[in-house]
Amino acid sequence: MGKPTGFMDYERQDKPAESPLERIKHFNEFHTPLSKEEQELQGARCMACGVPFCQSGKPLAGMASGCPLHNLVPEWNDLIYNGNWKEAYLRLKKTNNFPEFTSRVCPALCENACTCGLNQEAVASKSNEYAIIENAYEMGYAKANPPKVRTGKKVAVIGSGPSGLAAADLLNRRGHQVTVFEREDKPGGLLRYGIPNMKLEKQVIDRKIAIMEEEGIIFQTGCNVGKDVKAADILKEYDRVILACGASNPRDIKAPGRDAQGIYFAVDFLKSTTKALWANDMKLKTGSYISAKGKNVIVIGGGDTGNDCVGTSIRHGAKSVLQLEMMPKAPDERTPMNPWPEWPRVCKTDYGQQEAIAVFGSDPRVYTTTVKEFVKDKKGNLCKAVLIKLESKTDEKTGRKMMVPVEGSEYTVDADLVLIAAGFLGSQDYVTKAFGVEVNERTNVKTEAGKYSTNVKDVFAAGDMHRGQSLVVWAIREGREVAREVDESLMGYTNLYIQ
């Protein structure tokens, strides 16, 4: 610990964000990095706790506390304070294959478990992580390092999201020949088409993919395994197969009028925008995407994807935006029932909501509300939505609390575009059926607890396809763990050390 009083001497300093009214004019990342000197002082704020909850990644009250990757946060915080940026990068790389992704899109579980955050603002570990990886690219530390020896074993990874990429990265380091199959035109999975460019610029993905290709990983895009590529051919050609296809089945909304023109799943909306931007030099060309321009938009869902839809709709030029949340508004601060270091169940106003407040003058979120009916015009186009309030009631038979409609609370609003961001229900079943793997009642691939091997010999599963919809950081962890299990099955032992 290079600065024992750092947390008292220096205040937290975050990367400055461009103002909401300015950043909605573009689709680029909108935070300005701190100078290296400023970032080093942020590293000095780390207390080097005796029990560093920031790196624990343990479940508490049903949520993770600390980093699931067990990143050595206090170590690299101290290293950057002392100016040892290369060593900080090497220490970060030990536990995290993709800090360029997590430092942009992770909700910073480490910071919410930070001991410093008990009495003042937490250490800016996410910002420090960003600075470490970007400095590594700038200085040439982040570069290809192909394995010196090949094992002669071949592994197929189906899906190029964070879990598939993490598994491919580690297995390639071990010396296995890895081929990643991706049904889309470019690798990245949800990183590319499920997360907007203003949160994760796509050249950041391309930069890392280029290194992985230089290290010997083969990417085959436009290959839809289970449809235009036979599972039997994959099983015949490769020694092991990892299914990492994500949780791509969106949860639908059942309401009269659901067939109206103008209702889309959030992932299709976000994907169409990203594809249109990259096809037209980061400009939206009319007719090439699902447009919110001039429309009254309703976003159904209060999570990260819903917020992304709010921010994207505003950049399109939406006339109005409402975001519906089934649950009541969370408290502004922790309650006694939600103590540190549990994940804080508090109200967070994210970038999209901040932008809506700046543009429209009010928070777009409407709590304890859902759609009762979609109203169509004579041509079948969506024109209005009937909303209804919800309240919490306890089921007398099960004792479970559930949100139920409040009779007589209906009201009607204008709606030209509805975006359903209600979560996902597992992977599309044509892949699991093609390989013959079993799924559980939640439609996730079925394995033994703590294991990744499926009921089919030599076939493994990881990521959201295995654990269900989750965070990028959890997907990376699953990719690392499945790589270790696959390596051991191939070699009889493994030297892939996972924290």
What spans do the regions from the language model cover?
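Beta1-alpha1 glycine-rich phosphate/pyrophosphate-binding loop at the start
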Residues: T5-T32, L41-A44, G57, P68-N82, ...
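C-terminal catalytic lobe of FAD-dependent flavoproteins
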Residues: R12-E37, Q42-R45, Y367-T369, V375-K376, ...
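Glycine/serine-rich phosphate-binding loop and adjoining beta1-alpha1 elements at the start
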Residues: E40-S56, G62-P147, E213, T221, ...
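Feature captures the FAD/FMN-dependent oxidoreductase FAD-binding
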Residues: E87, V149, K154-I158, D206-P256, ...
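Phosphate-coordination loops involved in phosphoryl transfer and adenosine-cofactor binding
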Residues: T151-K154, G222, K293-N296, T368, ...
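Glycine-rich Rossmann-fold phosphate-binding loop(s) that bind the pyrophosphate
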Residues: I158-P162, G301-G303, D464
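FAD-site-proximal beta/loop scaffold in flavoenzymes
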Residues: Q261-G294, T394-Q469
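A conserved FAD-binding loop/helix module that cradles the flavin
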Residues: G306-C309, H316, A462-L496
